[in-house]
Curated annotation (Swiss-Prot):
Signal is among the record's keywords: no
Gene: pyrB
Residues binding carbamoyl phosphate, per UniProt: 58-59, 108, 136, 139, 264-265
Keyword Transferase in annotation: yes
Function: Catalyzes the condensation of carbamoyl phosphate and aspartate to form carbamoyl aspartate and inorganic phosphate, the committed step in the de novo pyrimidine nucleotide biosynthesis pathway.
Protein name, as recorded: Aspartate carbamoyltransferase catalytic subunit
NCBIfam families with a match to the protein in the record: asp_carb_tr, PRK00856.1
Organism: Desulfitobacterium hafniense (strain Y51)
Catalytic activity annotation: carbamoyl phosphate + L-aspartate = N-carbamoyl-L-aspartate + phosphate + H(+)
EC number: 2.1.3.2
UniProt cross-references to PROSITE patterns, sorted A to Z: CARBAMOYLTRANSFERASE
Subunit structure: Heterododecamer (2C3:3R2) of six catalytic PyrB chains organized as two trimers (C3), and six regulatory PyrI chains organized as three dimers (R2).
GO cellular component, one term: cytosol
Gene3D superfamilies given in the database record: Aspartate/ornithine carbamoyltransferase
One biological process term in Gene Ontology: 'de novo' UMP biosynthetic process
Amino acid sequence: MGWSRKDLLHIEDLPAKEIQLILNTAKPMKEIMSRAVKKLPTFRGKSVYNLFFESSTRTRTSFETAAKILGADTSSLAVAQSSLNKGETLLDTVRTLQAMKPDLVVIRHSSSGAAQFLAKELKAGVINAGDGQHEHPTQALLDLYTMQERLGSVEGRKILLVGDILHSRVARSNVWALKNLGAEVVLVGPPTLLPPEIKSWGVKTTFNLDEELPGSDVIMALRLQLERQQSGLLPSLREYSQLYGITAERVKKTGKQTLIMHPGPVNRGVEIESSIANSSQSVIEEQVTNGVAVRMAIMYLLLGGGTAHVVD
C-alpha cells in the first residue's frame, strides 16, 4: 500500500496497515545507518524545521540525524531562543514559519493539540514529537519496531507498561499502537499515577506489578518525573522503587527472556536497577538506534516516498 497522509499527529486512529508500512520502511533505513557513508541524496533541497517548545536533546537530535541522513536541510528553533519569550503566539510563529516555506515541520509542545493546530495552519507536513499529555507517536513506533525486531510480532504478546501512566504521552501512544497490532497490554502503577479515564482505554490496569510479571514478554518502565514526589503524588522515591522498580529479582519472576525497555532518560535505581538496564535483556540502546531509523521512515513517507521502497 502507499502513503497518503500529509502529517503524523497521533497513533490512536492509525490503522494497523499504516503502522506496519512505517515499520517495514524503517528496516532499510536502519541498514543505511550501518553504511560507511550515511547519506542519501533522496531529499536534497528539502527543508525540515524542528520546533521544540519543550526541552529534549535526545528526541531533537534523533530527528535532526534522521533528516540529515536523508539529505534534507535542517533548522531548529528552541523556545529559549524564540520570539515566544517576547509575547509572540503560536499562530504568529506558524505564520512566520509558513513564510519560510518548509517542506516538513517537527513540533514538540507542552499543550495537547498543538501539533494538530500547526498541521491545520501549515501547507507543510507536520510530525508530532510530543504534545502535552496527549501523544508521542514516533516513540510508540520506535518501541514497536524494537519489539518486532526482537519478538517477530507483538500479536498475543504480554506487554507491561509500568509507572506514571497519568502524565505519560508515551504510555498513551503505546497503548493505541499495541492494541492495533493485537498485543495484550497491562498498565501498572500506583493509584495516584493512573488517569481517571483509564477504563475507557480498554486494557487491563493493576496496582500490583508482581502479580503481572509471570509470562510477560516486555516490561517497559516509564520515566518518573521527580517532581511527582514534591507534588504529593508519591510518598517517596524509595517506596516507589520498592513497589514498581524493575529489579533482577522481578525480572526472574517473568520466567522468560523478557525484554526490558524505557523511553529514556532513565532514573537508575528508581525505575530500573542498573544491573538490569545494562543486561542483555535490556534493549534501551537499541530503542535509540531504532528511533533514528523509524523517524527516517516517517520523513521518507511524508516527503513523498509513498511506499516502503528506498531509493539508493
